[in-house]
UniProtKB/Swiss-Prot annotation:
Residue ranges constituting the 4Fe-4S ferredoxin-type domain according to the UniProt record: 369-397, 407-436
Enzyme Commission number, as recorded: 7.-.-.-
InterPro entries cross-referenced by the UniProt entry: 4Fe4S_Fe-S-bd, 4Fe4S_Fe_S_CS, Ion_transpt_RnfC/RsxC, Nuo51_FMN-bd, Nuo51_FMN-bd_sf, RnfC_N
Residues bound to [4Fe-4S] cluster 2: 387, 416, 419, 422
Organism: Escherichia coli O1:K1 / APEC
Subunit comment: The complex is composed of six subunits: RsxA, RsxB, RsxC, RsxD, RsxE and RsxG.
MF (Gene Ontology): 4 iron, 4 sulfur cluster binding; electron transfer activity; metal ion binding
Family assignment from sequence similarity: Belongs to the 4Fe4S bacterial-type ferredoxin family. RnfC subfamily.
Protein name according to UniProt: Ion-translocating oxidoreductase complex subunit C
Gene this protein is translated from: rsxC
Positions of region (Disordered): 630-682
């Protein structure tokens, strides 16, 4: 450790394996100062311009916005975006963005009003009096992300560093050819960059602060040294020009001699790195109170007449910037966003500038050279020699091409920084970086699917466990309810058990009777009498119910009378056809006659108790009386014409007598209840009564004969 610290004091630097030295081509754009670009008419602001999820929209179509006004809310790793100028929100819809595949992402489209009015700005000039948490939250809510190309939220990165950061590294290497955005920013705004570095140091409290810059930027080195002349807490380290010395792991090793482990982060070894442009954005957010709405973009290439570095508002269409730089496209013109090694070709020029856009390269045909056809790998190992991450690009190429994801993961394809050094030196012109990007995307998709499947499985298992717990709790409640009755139920159960035990004791107790005495059966007799009384009461109640139902309906009574008459006729026919030798028991005939008289009296009572409002039609009564007289005449004729040897059936005679008496009484009641205006013929009534008396006398005489 002592040797390591002494090496730091001597400004010792280390060198990493691999790397290349391509033509720099930086002099095209780093010789002119930063300039402003006229406002575009329309701005397209994608909601996601960083690593992580997009924020929540807080504006709607038709809203008036000011420059710096939040368009989304930032929570967690969601970084907000802000309006680049004042104007009106005309649409919120998907739009193609800065992506190798030009994927469409949800964007806010603003029509500028030309006034470019800011929101009220509240700067914290005394930021040292603010807490660490307040500063980190302000940096996050003002939309600051890594401007070196990764786009990781700066606030989240500072929060994750915590108290374990010992070394703060400011990346000023800018190693890729053509790009001079950081170089020009340090030349024109060195004091503001250093102020942003001091804010980061105040938040992290590291033991040392290192600025790493390549030796191909002499003007920027001079400006930084001038600003840091009286500072002893910040060290400026000039390193040799080598690509890709600006990589995070490579620059960390160059300045500290420490290597970031495979699959790890620089914070694991106590190092945190920020870009020069990010430090400048932190200064504007904290001290000036300005959210990030613009950044420095390099416009370069031989197809551009006015190359240089400009302040480009976020959301400005690429076409607008190129036109301002006097873009002269050829027939098959190519425009690259980023550098020639790590950038990607734009499918069209309507994509907007975002936070990670640091360069727009429009090369001529001479700069690009003739397109080379991809050849087969010759296993020369030049790619392995040039790889700064100590990987085996040749093996990764075969694994990627053969869809062998497990082997590619085992060979640490995730550590590939996609610098393009392997593709630069490949004699077979194999686009290795494209294969590696595709392979990493496929592996990420597979892991995402596995994660979703694991989450779904966890949710299913949690649901099953919850259902099992609920079932067990439900069974336990039922069991408790069955075993533990309420207090009143317990008392009732105890009383019932006591009665049962008492009865059992009485049943098992022997009855002792002394000699000459009788057992006391009074209790048994009383119980028997009580049961009989209860049965009689129930029978009487049932009989009253039936009688009430019968009396309440006079129609039913009439129907029953008709049925009785039909049964009587049928009985007469059966007796007439019966054999003469079969004699009828006179006692049975008397019993049946008595039953008939009882039924007749019951019928009279029912008719007398019938509802008064139901009046008997006198016409019907007269008709029935006529029918009765006709039947009587017919019966007399049959008896007169009968053979002397045929004996009269006493049962039939008794029934007919009972029916005749019932009809006579019914006729009398009907006549008594008839309307006064409808008078009955007294002669007919007298005749009917005489006939009834004659029939009754005959029946009585026949009964006497039978008894003799």
């Amino acid at each position: 450790m002592l040797k390591l610290f002494s090496a730091f004091r001597k400004n010792k630097i280390w060198d990493f394996n691999g790397g290349i030295h391509p033509p720099e081509m930086k002099t095209q754009s780093n010789g002119t100062p930063l300039r402003q670009v006229p406002l575009a008419q329309r701005f397209v602001i994608p909601l996601k311009q960083h690593i992580g999820a997009e924020g929540e929209l807080c504006v709607s179509v038709g809203d008036k916005v000011l420059r710096g006004q939040p368009l989304t809310r930032g929570r967690g790793k969601m970084l907000p975006v802000h309006a680049p100028t004042s104007g009106t929100v005309t649409a919120i819809a998907p739009h193609s963005t800065a992506h190798p595949s030009a994927l469409a992402e949800l964007s806010v489209i603003i029509d500028a009003d030309g006034e470019d009015c800011w929101i009220p700005r509240d700067g914290w000039a005394d930021y040292r009096s603010r807490s660490r948490e307040e500063l980190i939250e302000r940096i996050h809510q003002f939309g600051v992300a890594g401007l070196g190309g990764a786009g990781f939220p700066t606030g989240v990165k500072l929060q994750g560093g915590g108290d374990k950061i010992e070394t703060l590294i400011i990346n000023a290497a800018e190693c890729e050819p053509y790009i001079t955005a950081d170089d020009r920013l340090m030349q024109d705004c060195a004091a503001q960059v250093v102020e942003g570095i001091r804010i980061l140091a105040h938040i992290l409290q590291p033991r040392e602060i290192l600025i790493g810059i390549e030796d191909n930027k002499p003007q920027a080195i001079s400006m930084l040294r001038a600003v840091l002349a009286d500072s002893h807490d910040i060290s400026l380290r000039v390193i040799p020009t080598k690509y890709p010395s600006g990589g995070a792991k490579q620059l960390t090793y160059i300045l500290t001699g420490k290597q970031v482990p495979h699959g790890g982060r620089s914070s694991d070894i106590g190092v945190l790195m920020q870009n020069v442009g990010t430090a400048y954005a932190v200064k504007r957010a904290v001290i000036d109170g300005e959210p990030i709405t613009e950044r420095v973009v390099t416009l370069t290439g031989e197809a551009i007449a006015r190359p240089g570095n400009v302040w480009a508002r976020l959301g400005t269409p690429v076409r607008h910037l190129l036109n301002d730089a006097e873009f002269c496209p050829s027939a098959d013109q190519m425009v690259i966003m980023g550098g020639p090694l790590m950038g990607f070709t734009l499918p069209w020029l309507d994509v907007p500038v975002v936070k990670i856009t640091n360069c727009l390269l429009a090369p001529s045909a001479n700069e690009l050279g003739e397109p080379q056809e991809e050849q087969s790998c010759i296993r020369c190992s030049a790619c392995a020699d040039a790889c700064p991450a100590d990987l085996l690009p040749q093996q990764l190429y075969w694994f990627s091409k053969g869809q062998q994801h497990d082997k590619a993961t085992t060979h640490n394809i995730a550590d590939c920084i996609e610098c393009g050094a392997c593709a630069w030196v490949c004699p077979s012109n194999i686009p290795l970086v494209q294969y590696f990007r595709q392979e990493k995307a496929e592996i990420a998709a597979i892991r995402q699917e596995e994660k979703r499947a694991a989450e779904a499985k966890a949710r299913f298992e949690a649901r099953q466990a919850r259902l099992e717990r609920e079932k067990a709790a439900r069974l336990e409640r039922h069991k408790s309810a069955a075993v533990q009755p309420a207090a009143k139920d317990k008392d009732a159960i105890a009383a019932a058990l006591a009665r049962v035990k008492e009865k059992q004791a009485q049943a098992t107790q022997p009855i002792v009777i002394k000699a000459g005495e009788r057992p006391d059966n009074s209790a048994i007799i009383a119980a028997r009498e009580a049961r009989k009384a209860q049965a009689r009461a129930k029978q009487a109640e049932l009989q009253q119910t039936n009688d009430a139902a019968t009396v309440a309906d006079p129609r039913k009574t009439a129907v029953e009378a008709a049925i009785a008459r039909a049964k009587a006729r049928k009985l007469e026919q059966q007796q007439a056809n019966a054999e003469p030798e079969e004699q009828i028991d006179p006692r049975k005939a008397a019993v049946e006659a008595a039953i008939a008289r009882a039924k007749a009296r019951k019928l009279e009572q029912q008719q007398a108790n019938a509802e008064p409002e139901e009046q008997i039609d006198p016409r019907k009564a007269a008709v029935e009386a006529a029918i009765a007289r006709a039947k009587a005449r017919k019966l007399e004729q049959q008896q007169a014409n009968a053979e002397p040897e045929e004996q009269i059936d006493p049962r039939k005679a008794a029934v007919e007598a009972a029916i005749a008496r019932a009809k006579a009484r019914k006729l009398e009641q009907q006549q008594a209840n008839a309307e006064p205006e409808e008078q009955i013929d007294p002669r007919k009534a007298a005749v009917a009564a005489a006939i009834a008396r004659v029939q009754a006398k005959k029946a009585a005489q026949q009964k006497v004969v039978n008894e003799d």
